[in-house]
């Protein structure tokens, strides 16, 4: 630009140079995709394949399948509309605060391209250069699973507008002891299944004849003794003692996509005989009867897990108190917080903010002993439907003696369209209830004790 202004003073002499500059500029602009008429081939396919197709293909949650040009162009106007108003792709975390793996986020220019494409009639473009649609494994996060276990019985969800809490046992028997690299949970009913916390039961050699003993689906009554439930499920060894239980090997919340760590991080030992225990299987209220038969997919590893991950829950049912106690008065917007202090230096892998329907916003951060703040996650507009386990691109290193803090704002007024009560009622934590209409405030973190070099590990795949 400076060059241009200078030349302007001596117009005659500068004119050919200016023409030359203009020519270069035109060539440059026309070779630059962004200003070109967006077509399916030159721009739209790659945007949709990255940000939409993972959930919009057969067997996935998104209803519409967006794989071929026909499927995508047919819905160009709808795609333009849902992206313009920010409804899709679903990514509640503020990317200006912290960044994660596998973000579903459109840049301003991608957003504009989708609008422009729809307005101009969704052209295909150069049909010889259509990008290949991405390869996905049906119903699967990555390659073919080594073991697929389905709930032995489908759960009939009665349409009585009441929350339901179940425990399912998925027994298995394999050829020999092995290692688990990753576990994937595929809900059979994504509309109604709100939560699941999966544990792994391992029977030592010779301790259990028939892993299928007992009931496979039991209602989880909050007041019933847990041991009684475990006995009904036939979890005990043949001598009546209980086998080892590895807690929280897999968790599900609305929209969660399973996390897969690089080899060497996470993973579990898996004995020849055992069972997955799907606890806290929580189905939201529905007026229409429905059913669920969820599936667990297991990916075996070759090596023993070197660095098992640790999980910590802050807040409701967790290790730190919610302050003030989580009681949300009607017709008010109120704020709560919870925090812990780290007793060792840690490498933080994932964070999962969890609230229910009254959630309005959420913020998680760490404060180092020297006073510096490490931003962890910020959700400016809470959305109950998308509660990812956000995975950092690289572990976030948090020094020993840091405070890990979470702040949640709840909107218990009539202006919250998700408020389950009209007029609003006092809502809060109730005993150990996890009903959708009661509230929870949790910040779940997964981490490793720090090791030198952790800051350079890539968690992307
Ligand atoms: C993480 C999964 C996920 C991603 C990524 C995603 N969607 Fe969706 N989408 C869904 C689900 C699930 C629904 C069903 C609606 C619901 O339950 O809220 C949906 C619904 C829709 C609908 C139907 C809206 C209606 O009114 O019926 C459209 C259109 C849509 N998505 C377009 C897109 C587009 C375009 C993208 C990419 C820019 C995208 N989605 C990315 C999961 C996803």
Language-model regions: role of each:
Residues 180-181, 268-283, 396-410:
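Noncatalytic modules at the cell exterior or secretory-pathway interfaces
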């Amino acid at each position: 630009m400076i060059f241009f202004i200078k030349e302007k003073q001596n117009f005659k002499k500068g004119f050919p140079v200016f023409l030359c500059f203009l020519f270069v500029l035109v060539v440059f602009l026309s070779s630059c995709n962004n200003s070109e008429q967006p077509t399916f081939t030159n721009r739209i396919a790659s945007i949709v394949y990255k940000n939409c197709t993972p959930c919009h293909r057969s067997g996935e949650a998104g209803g519409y399948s967006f794989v071929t040009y026909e499927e995508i162009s047919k819905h160009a106007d709808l795609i333009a509309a849902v992206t313009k108003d920010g409804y899709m792709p679903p990514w509640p975390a503020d990317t200006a605060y912290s960044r994660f793996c596998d973000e579903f986020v459109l840049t301003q220019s991608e957003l504009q391209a989708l609008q422009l494409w729809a307005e101009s009639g969704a052209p295909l473009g150069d049909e010889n250069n259509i990008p290949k649609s991405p390869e996905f494994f049906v119903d699967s996060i990555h390659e073919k699973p080594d073991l697929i276990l389905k709930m032995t019985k489908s759960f009939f969800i009665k349409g009585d507008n009441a929350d339901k809490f179940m425990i399912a046992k998925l027994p298995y028997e394999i050829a020999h002891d092995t290692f688990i690299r990753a576990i994937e949970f595929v809900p059979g009913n994504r509309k109604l299944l709100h939560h699941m916390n999966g544990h792994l039961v391992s029977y030592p050699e010779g301790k259990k004849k028939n892993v299928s003993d007992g009931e496979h689906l039991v209602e989880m009554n909050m007041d019933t003794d847990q041991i009684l439930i475990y006995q009904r499920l036939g979890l005990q060894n043949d001598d009546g003692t209980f086998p080892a239980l590895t807690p929280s090997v897999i968790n599900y919340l609305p929209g969660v996509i399973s996390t897969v760590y690089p080899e060497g991080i996470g993973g579990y030992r898996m004995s020849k005989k055992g069972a997955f225990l799907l606890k806290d299987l929580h189905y939201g209220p529905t007026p229409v009867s429905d059913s669920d038969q969820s599936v667990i997919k297991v990916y075996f590893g070759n090596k023993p897990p070197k660095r098992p991950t640790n999980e910590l829950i802050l807040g409701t049912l967790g290790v730190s108190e919610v302050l003030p106690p989580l009681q949300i008065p009607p017709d008010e917007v109120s704020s709560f917080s919870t925090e812990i202090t780290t007793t060792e230096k840690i490498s933080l892998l994932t964070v999962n903010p969890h609230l229910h329907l009254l959630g309005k916003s959420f913020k998680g951060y760490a404060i180092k002993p020297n006073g510096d703040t490490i931003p962890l996650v910020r959700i400016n507009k809470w959305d109950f439907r998308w509660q990812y386990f956000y995975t950092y691109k690289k572990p976030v290193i948090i020094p020993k003696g840091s405070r890990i803090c979470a702040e949640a704002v709840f909107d218990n007024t009539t202006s919250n369209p998700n408020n389950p009560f009209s007029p609003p009622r006092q809502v809060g934590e109730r005993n150990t209830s996890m009903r959708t209409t009661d509230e929870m405030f949790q910040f779940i973190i997964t981490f490793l004790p720090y090791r030198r070099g952790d800051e350079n590990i890539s968690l992307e795949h």
